[in-house]
Amino acid sequence: MAYATGITFASRSILPICSRTFLSPLRVASLLVFPEKSSATFFRRVQVPHLFSTSTTTLFSSVKCSIHSTSSPETENQAVFRPNVVDILEERGLLESITSENLRSACSDPKVAPLRVYCGFDPTAESLHLGNLLGIIVLSWFQRCGHQAVGLIGGATGRVGDPSGKSLERPELDADTLEKNIAGITKIIIKILGSNPSPGGSYVIFNNYDWWKDMTMLDFLNKVGRFARVGTMMAKESVKKRLESEQGMSYTEFTYQLLQAYDFLHLFKNEGINVQIGGSDQWGNITAGTDLIRKILQAEEAAYGLTFPLLLKNDGTKFGKSEDGAIWLSPSMLSPYKFYQYFFSVPDVDVIRFLKTLTFLSLDEIKILEDQMSKPGYVPNTAQIKLAEEVTRFVHGEEGLKEAIKATEALRPGAETKLDWNLIERIAEDIPSCSLPIDRVSGLSIVDLSVSAGLFESKSAARRMLKQGGFYMNNERVDDENKRVDEEDIVEGRGLVLSAGKKNKVVVRIS
């Protein structure tokens, strides 16, 4: 059984701390929940060089690590108290279904070893998105309650595509794209689960391509196919919806649930992983796994499934999409500033619910914020600021949060922060921009410039905004519609920022 207490990227190498050793369940529990009390325990780091020059599909199977421990019989017999993570998830609106109530009791039973809980992520893009974040948050809750979090990268299943919640078959990805996506997603999981504090501090990552790459069709039919019933597979909601649609369903997609079921069987049998989590649309795939474990291993009530609700807005639409597309978790695909702004813009009707599901703030603290929102002295967006700060910190760390706050303050109309070109260049990736020659900008009326830059559709619209007091240049309000741009208005001779109200902005570069 492999236990990892942290993995971090170091340039082109990866430093794991894990173990493949024989410890009693209670000893493992004490290591996971109270690592600081195990002063006699030490870890040997093994460096795996050239992370991106080797196949990421075999990266984690090649890692060999050790835990050396000098435990006494007394410490092995110590019971460990753990908060009941299922109760916590239920209180915060993060619990949809569980396969057995025995999972709830196992979560806090001091006589039961810590659970090993996994969530799967197919590498369909180079980054995870906001829809995947709930899975990481639930994993982190298990981590914080003393259990081990496991991320499963779908290096094999990503080549097939999960039909759950999809109206069309996913496009096929080539090997190079898959490798790139696997590396990107792995890096995100490591950054988030490795950077945030937890009592166990424990997580590990697997890639299911490691056990699928050598399996033949005959092996699959013998090991999995003969235990599957077509009627049961047809009854899955994800299958029924697709079969009723005009597009139908390919055989490849139809067998996806068996691939995911075998993943659970393999992890349960070989790694001692006994809980699978996923969104509510994964219920059919998860129960296919628990059924397969029961049939093949005759293991009753030994493997569990847990689902959480999909992230929805108050109007029932999915939360996690913007006008520009998905809300990515990778800073290279969506800056921390833009990520922060998305949560800052959450309406009042949704913000308290999202504070419960997307942050680790105590429910008491959230209740205080909720009560304040209905009082006369409440400062608008206080709850949204807290939500944006907490989620941005969890995903991008303290540095990412600082970057987001700095950019937000610098772009706030009327802000006293002096704009510099380096800051403007960074935020220009997240807001509309245009390039104009100096002879077209210098001496041009501010109204004409705003139309040429695309901030307004017409001069009359620009004048209306100006009269309403919502027209800004470099965060300074423009009151005179006859104002013309001079050299002092151009930041470091390279550009300027025009704003219409709080949200609509454009960067004008001087070419």
From Swiss-Prot:
Q: Which SMART domains match?
A: S4
Q: Which residues form the S4 RNA-binding domain?
A: 444-510
Q: In chain numbering, where does the motif 'KMSKS' region fall?
A: 318-322
Positions that bind L-tyrosine: Y118, D162, Y256, Q260, D263, Q282
Q: Which GO terms describe its cellular component?
A: chloroplast; chloroplast stroma; mitochondrion
Single Gene Ontology BP term? embryo development ending in seed dormancy
Reactions it catalyzes: tRNA(Tyr) + L-tyrosine + ATP = L-tyrosyl-tRNA(Tyr) + AMP + diphosphate + H(+)
Listed EC numbers: 6.1.1.1
Pfam families in the cross-refs: SYY_C-terminal, tRNA-synt_1b
Record motif 'HIGH' region, residues: 123-132
Query: Is-annotated flag, keyword Ribonucleoprotein?
Result: no
**Description of the deletion phenotype:** Embryo defective. Developmental arrest of the embryo at the preglobular stage.
Recorded GO terms, molecular function?
Answer: ATP binding; RNA binding; tyrosine-tRNA ligase activity
- Family matches, as InterPro entries: aa-tRNA-synth_I_CS, aa-tRNA-synth_Ic, Rossmann-like_a/b/a_fold, S4_RNA-bd, S4_RNA-bd_sf, SYY-like_C, Tyr-tRNA-ligase, Tyr-tRNA-ligase_bac-type
- Full protein name: Tyrosine--tRNA ligase, chloroplastic/mitochondrial
